[in-house]
Amino acid sequence: MPIEARASAARFVRAILRCDNAGLTESHAGNPMIHHLRNVLQPDELAKLRAIAERSQFVDGRISNPNHPLKRNQQIPQNDPAAVEPGAILRDALFRHPELRVAAQARNMANPTISRYEPGMSYGWHMDEALFPSQPAMRSDVSVTVFLSDPQEYDGGELMITLGQHVLPIKLAAGDAVLYPSTTIHQVAPVTRGVRLVGITWIQSYIPDVAQRELLQQIEEARTIEMARGDKAEMRMLLLLGSLRNNLFRMWSDA
């Protein structure tokens, strides 16, 4: 391995090990805590989910959080047989997406369901529950919203996430998803026109700490960049990065 490459690798590793939470949570539109997954749903899957929502019986969204007075939406109950098919479509699509593994390090996923917001509905500032009463209990590390309505179909309804002193509004194309830490305070702004349909779920990660997940993602991105060089890729660099990734996973994983 050339001296320059070894020095570069050493600097890269030292930079990773020096990173702290403050550097990883700087608030801006490209914040590494927030992951935009494009084209999670295929067009036929999106159409099927919208058709299911059209014919399904929605109930008061407080069924899943009765103690939150600011939750004003509707959802298909997660224990309703009608939730099985859309839940499976959303789950399979998310696990199929190549960026989910790196971004979430998913260990388990709650049963997805569909939520609906009509004009006047919203979900005030809140933080998602830490544990879900499943068997066994599941911890929420990563919150997931899959957008089923195009932004032009409704006004308002932005998912608003607090990042330090900033608030990041998110309103994505139908079929796209956003992942964000379940530890963030967030809200859904009031819908003023149209209908906002979304799929929602939560992920328990093998790596509970968001900063550690981001470091592993940076290492994976570095490996991808090096592998993209093809025959010019430095095998020793790839070996070191792969070793670093695997050993940090062993160190941090709660498996």
Feature-to-residue mapping (PLM):
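Mature extracytoplasmic/luminal segments of secretory-pathway proteins
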Residues: 15-16
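Non-heme Fe(II)/2-oxoglutarate
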Residues: 27-113, 215-255
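Catalytic core of non-heme Fe(II) oxygenases with the double-stranded beta-helix
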Residues: 98-199, 203-217
